[in-house]
Amino acid sequence: MRTMGRFVAIFFVMVAVPTVATTPQEPPLTVEVRHYARSLQPGEVVRVTATFSRPVRAVRAAAFGSVVPFQPTSDQRIWSGLVGIDLDVEIGEHLVSILGTSPDGTTARTGHPLAVKSKEFATRRLTVAPEYVTPPDEVIERIQREGARTTKLFNTQTPTAHWRGAFLRPVTGEATSAFGRRSVFNGQARSPHSGADFRASKGTPVKAPNSGVVVLANDLYFSGNCVIIDHGLGLYSFFAHLSRIGVSEGDRIASGDIIGDVGATGRVTGPHLHWTVRLNTARVDPLSLMAVLSNGG
């Protein structure tokens, strides 16, 4: 009977203790960040890539005081964004702050350093019509109005990307006036050259470097006939001094579409194509954008 009693007691204990199923915990969410650029200097574009240990549903990032939109790959683990280093940036170390959030609400945060180095820009001296150095009183209001409009456009960050892949060269001619050169017109210093000039004869067709939406197609006092394309996510192309505008505001254009012809309108010394790029308001070199996005953009 004792043996039976022990057996019953043991059996009771075994059935009284339930089996607890343990769910394996997710490993901590981590992130590794890398960047690619021609150099870390004023006017350069930097592609920043964040690789998370598992898929995330959202990434928030910022650099140089601006929000930096990040886009995911198909598996939501790898996200990337473009950072612009403005011409007037303070030299030294800056951080790209990145915050990723997984579907279950887990977050991973990091600050990726970008050590910006100084760059010397050459000076160009040009002679232009006097009214483009000291504009007459009757056009001052026009200049201010046009400046306010373009500033508002460049400050607008469209939430979706219209562009895809590498950016094309808008004309085949070589670059003749480098980005960032200090400009002296008729002996008077003016703002730096915030674009790149390309050699081309009057009437040469200008191709859209990538897809986007035309947000300005008009004649501006200093820029002449010009076209601004919104590529999305704070990225804009601005083409100036055209002899002909071939698109209208609101047009959706594809990479390679003809947007106009090279000319010599506005403040110029001769026919050429001027291409400015703005990235989240930063003035950046179009050639830097082309280089970064041609390398796995």
Tell me the role of every PLM-derived stretch.
Residues R34-H35, T110-S223:
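Surface-exposed, glycine-biased beta-strand/turn segments
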Residues W79-S97:
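Ligand-binding face of N-terminal immunoglobulin V-set domains in extracellular IgSF glycoproteins
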Residues Q25-G43:
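N-terminal edge beta-strand
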Residues L168-G297:
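Catalytic cores of peptidoglycan-degrading enzymes
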Residues L99-P103:
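Beta-strand-rich extracellular modules
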Residues E44-S53:
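Aromatic/hydrophobic beta-strand junction motif of beta-rich domains
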Residues V67-T73, L114:
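Short, surface-exposed loop motifs enriched in S/T, G, D/E and P with embedded aromatic residues
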